[in-house]
């Protein structure tokens, strides 16, 4: 296909146009008074949403070059989402501000490479400062505050996540389900999560989120490699008759068998998903045995004289629900407490008997996985559209609280970044010079952009609010919900330090890449043929 090649200023301006479009559509959602965005869906009802990264993923422009700009900023949002699970809108606003200021300087003749160096040095300085400012989380009250802010000021959600963390521990698994009622409820059940995702993306049942969700599945556990599809056929036939889904957890599934499973899944013959077993060697077998206990099934292993081709339905485990994405699998089981407790006691005995610190650590890990359970939040809403929005907000809140537990919290509402701007100005003027200093100044100017946008969305003057906040003590900021200047930590307006840090780093990274772009190669738009006259309908005849 023919390509279009654009150089220099023209290339950067085209990228900028795409970036402007995406940044504006995402920025309207920022802050407690941020608005919603409606996404049109090809099938089903439109989706009303307040989540930056979801909006960013939906935007596709007709112009290929502008679309490249959209994709770059989308990357800042999705990388922040992968690292911290929240703060995607902030990352987008920061990246946009840095790109706009940087392009002005490049157009005026500044050297883009030196500017990028300045941006990188300023970012390193700020990351250290954010670390110094962060306060470790000590009680469930702080966890609740974090969840509340991330869920768009929903106190009920914040409290529920704090309760869930109390029950399953800070490392515990919190899973989301669509509830059957109007209210959102919390339930703690047996279950476990392990770090292996689906073997093939074709197993995903929800292609938008790339997740496989199996309700009340049978679970086949085996410690052997499945190479021949003939070994699986008897089990597949038995499960297909019941009409229930099947999850296969095995050491590995080789090409032929995997292809057969995928084809059956795509044709709708059997809802099946396959996952590699976690761990290695003896530890893998022990973890599979733990899963067998949890799901009330048997581990099909030749050590116990069991062969895959002779497996029957009563050897398979069952669970209430299994959720699998590309990296992790979560099994939510129920009604098997006695066996699980007995297995936990057995692991504790092994821990007492072993002298090796490594073995103790691994046994402790298994014990935590088995005994910790899974907190299931059942999302309640009046309509499906509200349910989807609520689910995304809850997901942000869960991710934000986990990030807060990891790296602590900082004052929220864009306050921390705004307060760091003067400190960065002092540091850069004494440590950097020339165009590197200009690069640092670009970052300094961008630091107030999230706060300004939050204020503007609440109907205040962003520039005035930003200057007022800078002149106040470090923890003081602007509460956009009430329009007052308050101590953010006391008011419970907090952000996880990890979210603030990731957003800043990803924004600076993308800004640096855009500024140093000198050429774009993109597809030429396809020419549409003007439709020729149909057969038997002579083009030039008069009728």
Curated annotation (Swiss-Prot):
Catalytic activity of the protein: ATP + H2O + a folded polypeptide = ADP + phosphate + an unfolded polypeptide
State the InterPro entries in the record.
Chaperonin_Cpn60_CS, Cpn60/GroEL, Cpn60/GroEL/TCP-1, GroEL-like_apical_dom_sf, GROEL-like_equatorial_sf, TCP-1-like_intermed_sf
Q: Which GO terms describe its molecular function?
A: ATP binding; ATP-dependent protein folding chaperone; isomerase activity; unfolded protein binding
EC number(s) per entry: 5.6.1.7
List the PROSITE patterns.
Answer: CHAPERONINS_CPN60
Residues that hold ATP according to the record: 29-32, 86-90, 413, 479-481, 495
| Keywords assigned by UniProt, alphabetized | ATP-binding, Chaperone, Cytoplasm, Isomerase, Nucleotide-binding
Isomerase as UniProt keyword: yes
**What SUPFAM superfamilies does the annotation carry?**
GroEL apical domain-like, GroEL equatorial domain-like
Complex and partners: Forms a cylinder of 14 subunits composed of two heptameric rings stacked back-to-back. Interacts with the co-chaperonin GroES.
Return the similarity comment: Belongs to the chaperonin (HSP60) family.
This chain belongs to the protein called: Chaperonin GroEL 1
Origin species: Prochlorococcus marinus (strain NATL2A)
User: Gene name on record?
Assistant: groEL1
């Amino acid at each position: 296909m023919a390509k279009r090649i654009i150089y220099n200023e023209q290339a950067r301006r085209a990228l900028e146009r795409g970036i402007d479009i995406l940044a504006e559509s995402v920025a309207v959602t920022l802050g407690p008074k941020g608005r919603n965005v409606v996404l049109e869906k090809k099938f089903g009802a439109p989706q009303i949403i307040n989540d930056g990264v979801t909006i960013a993923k939906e935007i596709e422009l007709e112009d290929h070059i502008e679309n490249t700009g959209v994709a770059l900023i989308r990357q800042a949002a999705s990388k922040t989402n992968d690292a911290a699970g929240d703060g995607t809108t902030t990352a987008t606003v920061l990246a946009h501000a840095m790109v706009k200021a940087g392009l002005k300087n490049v157009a005026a003749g500044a050297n883009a490479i030196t500017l990028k160096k300045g941006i990188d040095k300023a970012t390193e300085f700020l990351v250290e400062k954010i670390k110094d400012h962060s306060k470790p989380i000590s009680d469930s009250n702080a966890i609740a505050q974090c969840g509340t802010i991330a869920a768009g000021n929903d106190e009920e959600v914040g409290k529920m996540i704090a309760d869930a963390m109390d029950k399953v521990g800070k490392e515990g698994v919190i899973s989301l389900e669509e509830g059957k009622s109007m209210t959102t409820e919390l339930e703690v059940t047996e279950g476990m999560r392990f770090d292996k995702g689906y073997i093939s993306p074709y197993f995903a049942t929800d292609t938008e989120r790339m997740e496989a969700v199996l309700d009340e599945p049978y679970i086949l556990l085996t410690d052997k490699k499945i190479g021949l599809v003939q070994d699986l056929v008897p089990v597949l036939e038995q499960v297909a008759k019941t009409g229930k889904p099947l999850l296969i957890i095995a050491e590995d599934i080789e090409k032929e068998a995997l292809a057969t499973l995928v084809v059956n899944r795509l044709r709708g013959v059997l809802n099946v998903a396959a996952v590699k077993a976690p761990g290695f060697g003896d530890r893998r077998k022990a973890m599979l045995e733990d899963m067998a206990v949890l799901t009330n099934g048997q581990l099909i292993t030749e050590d116990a004289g069991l062969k895959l081709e002779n497996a029957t339905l009563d050897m398979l485990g069952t669970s209430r629900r299994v959720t699998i994405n590309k990296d992790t699998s979560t099994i939510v089981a129920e009604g098997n407490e006695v066996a699980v407790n007995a297995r936990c006691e057995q692991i504790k005995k092994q821990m007492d008997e072993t002298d090796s610190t490594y073995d103790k650590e691994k046994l402790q890990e298994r014990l935590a996985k088995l005994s910790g359970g899974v907190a299931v939040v059942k999302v309640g809403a009046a309509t499906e559209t509200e349910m989807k929005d609520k689910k995304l907000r809850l997901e942000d809140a869960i991710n934000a609280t986990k990030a807060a537990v990891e790296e602590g919290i900082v004052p929220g509402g864009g306050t921390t970044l705004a307060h760091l701007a003067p400190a960065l100005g002092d540091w850069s003027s004494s440590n950097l010079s020339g165009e590197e200093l200009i690069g640092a100044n670009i970052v300094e100017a961008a630091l107030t952009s999230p706060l300004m946008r939050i204020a503007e969305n609440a109907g205040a003057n962003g520039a005035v609010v930003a200057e007022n906040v800078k002149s106040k003590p470090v923890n003081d900021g602007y509460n956009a919900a009430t329009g007052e200047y308050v101590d953010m930590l006391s008011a419970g307006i907090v952000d996880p330090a990890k979210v603030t840090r990731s957003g800043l780093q990803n924004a600076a990274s993308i800004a640096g890449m855009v500024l140093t772009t000198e050429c774009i190669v993109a597809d030429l738009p396809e020419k549409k043929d003007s439709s020729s006259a149909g057969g038997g309908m002579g083009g030039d005849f008069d009728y």
